[in-house]
A protein has these predicted regions:
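Glycine-rich phosphate-binding loops of nucleotide-dependent enzymes
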Residues: 2-237
Length: 237
């Protein structure tokens, strides 16, 4: 069985006096795709932000058996965790290529340019737009850039927050196909927050259902996607 790469235990997260996550616990195993599902307001984005050191938390977050609960966001990136936020989060005034270079801020090796070329090979449209500002790209192109920029840090774990949000179905399909390739061919472990339950579970190994800041269901993705009661009750089916 694969090793546990990321583990959250009794994790709470708050914005000021408002507690959003109420002691949740979950695991992500090495080389798997795990998804967190739930309706708007369930706490999905807060979960990803908590793992990235962006909100106040209690409980324990371990990555490769090391406690990262109190680390700042940039230190978490240096440990091997990259975050693609909801809404793309590119630097709109920078060019496509400069955005990619920003993604490699923790690196000092000689492979950065090769990795930029790999991003262009994965998404040829980014090569075509490499001298344009990120703000001039379409929504789908910005999402491709956001994912590529995160990969420039060579993460072991990629956190993706609502990657399908606001995108045309054909763009979403292409993105998720690329996620599968990244996982199967390159061994990138992923934790994906999604509202599109059928799409996410269709590519995942493991799923968690979040409701009102608590994990109410967890299990193999295949079992969740085939459980009509779960789909109806929690996933909008």
């Amino acid at each position: 069985m694969a090793d546990v790469l990321l583990k959250a235990e009794n994790l709470t997260a708050s914005y000021g006096q408002i507690e959003v996550l109420h002691g949740i616990s979950f695991e992500v195993f090495d080389n798997e795709i795990a998804v967190i599902l739930g309706a708007n307001g369930a706490g999905k984005t807060t979960t990803i932000r908590a793992l990235s050191g962006m909100v106040e938390t209690t409980g324990t977050i371990t990555f490769k058996k090391e406690d990262i609960s109190q680390l700042e966001s940039d230190a978490i990136v240096r440990k091997g965790v990259a975050h693609v936020p909801q809404g793309r989060g590119t630097f709109p005034e920078l060019t496509v290529e400069d955005n990619l270079r920003v993604g490699a801020f923790i690196r000092s090796d000689n492979e950065v340019q090769n990795d930029i070329q790999n991003c262009y090979d994965s998404y040829p449209v980014l090569f075509e737009r490499r001298t344009q500002t990120a703000g001039s790209l379409s929504g789908g192109e910005q999402q491709m850039l956001a994912v590529s920029r995160a990969l420039m840090s060579r993460p072991e774990l990629l956190l993706l927050d609502e990657p399908s949000l606001g995108l045309a179905p054909q763009i979403v399909e292409a993105l998720f196909e690329r996620f599968l390739i990244m996982n199967k061919d390159h061994g990138t472990t992923m934790l994906i927050v999604e509202q599109n339950a059928q799409l996410a579970l269709g590519m995942a190994d493991r799923g968690y259902v979040l409701e009102a800041g608590e994990i109410v269901i967890e299990g193999a993705a295949e079992s969740l996607i085939n459980d009509e009661a779960i789909i109806r009750a929690y996933l909008g089916g």
